[in-house]
C-alpha cells in the first residue's frame, strides 16, 4: 500500500507572520506624543527586540518601530501609570507605560489587565534576551504619501550606509511621515527611537543613522543649526523697530 500523498496547506490559513520571528502580536491602544490622542493599532513584538505597530493585523503598513532590546528602563501597568488617562470606555487596569533608556516613553492600553501583564512580561523578556542567530524579521517600512500617490519604502534593520530623513507629523494620519526636505513646512524631527523635537517656523534636517549607530552627534548639530537660523530670523524681524 503506497503512502498517502501529503496534503498541501490551506491557503486560507496562511499568515503574514509565517516564517517570521514573531514573539507576540495583538491589538493595543497607543497614545500619540503630540496631540495625546488614543489610536488603536496592531502591535508586533519581533525576535530581534523591536516593537512595530501597524494599521491592521496584516502588518503590511508599518507606522513605526521602537527598539526594545536593552532599551527598556522600566514598565508600569495599571494604577502605577499616574500621568496618563485610559481611552474612553477602557479600564485603567489595562494601561502600560514603557520608559525607554533613550528618553522616550510609550503609553499603551490593553483590553484587559491580564493582557497588559502578558505584554509587560513579553517586553521585559525581549529587553534582556538577545536575538538568536538566523532569526528572520520583516524589513522596516515607511509609507510616504504625496498628493498624487502613495508608495512604500523599505530598508533592512542594520546597514552601514547613512541616510538623510525629514520626519513630518501629520495630524490627519496621527503619525510621522518620511518626506523630502520642504522649506515651506514646519518639520518635527526626532531621534529614531526618541522623543520628538519641534522647531516652529524652521525646517530641521539631520543625518540619521540606522539603529546600529549613534545619532546623537548629527541630532545635536541639527538642533544647533536650527537654533542659529531661528535667532537670525528673529533679529531680522525686529530690525525695523530701530529706525
Curated annotation (Swiss-Prot):
State the tissue distribution. Answer: Highly expressed in retina and brain. Levels are very low or not detectable in all other tissues tested.
One GO location term (cellular component)? cytoplasm
The record ties this protein, via PROSITE patterns, to: PH_DOMAIN (PS50003)
Q: Highest taxon of the source?
A: Eukaryota
Q: Name one Pfam family in it.
A: PH
- What keywords were assigned to this record? Cytoplasm, Developmental protein, Membrane
**BP term (GO), one:** phototransduction
Location in the cell reads: Membrane; Cytoplasm
Residues covered by the PH domain: 21-128
Quaternary structure annotation from Swiss-Prot or TrEMBL: Homodimer. Interacts (via PH domain) with MYO1C. Interacts (via PH domain) with MYO7A. Binds transducins.
* Name of the protein in its database record: Pleckstrin homology domain-containing family B member 1
